[in-house]
Amino acid sequence: MDTNKNNNNSSKEAKAYLPPAEDVILKFMNKRAYKGTFIDFGCNDGYFTFTSEKFFTNVIGVDLSIDTINELLRTRPESSDAKFIRSHNYTTALPDGSADVIFMFHILKKIPNVKQFVKEIKRLLKEDGELWILEIEKTEADLGLKASDDYFIPKEELITRLKDDELHFIEYIDINESYYGVKFTKNEDLFMRFY
């Protein structure tokens, strides 16, 4: 079964309600200057990957599908320096502490073992790194998707599933009526110095 094809179709439907990638990234940045390495985990068609190059020095797209990665390499803009790697189940070949920001768009519901996945996220984040998660808000319109309730993940459930002694919830990001963002960090004390 080609789950990537199903994921691509639902992603295309959902993106019809999504603001431009640059607007989403700026909302997560919240007037704070970022640099360093941005990892787009579950990069799919590169919607956020390529746009993030405006704000970060190094950009890496990660996806399970080698076909997706090959397509991104074939079609990426000439000006792009983004790198792409394939993840294997819950791991990547990236070194420990390589990410200033890890970004994910609507992939948590597709991950069977969230704890194992979070372990890899924590390994990849720098000590002051941040995890940015963009999810679909269940609304009356449901974004026009023919989706069951398990397509959506409520904010509270997302926070409960991810936060632990090493990953701390920072804030909600109001994207629009159809999407919400959530920020986590490994080091709450370091993060608070910037605010």
Regions found by a protein language model. Name each.
Residues 4-5, 9-18, 130-183:
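C-terminal alpha-helical "lid/dimerization" subdomain adjacent to the S-adenosyl-L-methionine
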Residues 17-36:
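Conserved alpha-helix/loop element of class I SAM-dependent methyltransferases that forms part
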Residues 39, 44-91:
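Class I SAM-dependent methyltransferase SAM/SAH-binding core
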Residues 90-102:
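A short acidic, Gly/Pro-enriched loop at the edge of an enzyme's catalytic core
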Residues 100-113:
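A short SAM/SAH-binding and catalytic strip from SAM-dependent methyltransferases
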Residues 115-130:
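A short glycine-rich, Lys/Arg-flanked "PGG" loop and its adjoining helix->strand segment in the class I
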Residues 183-195:
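C-terminal lobe and adjacent flexible extensions of AdoMet/dcAdoMet transferase-like proteins
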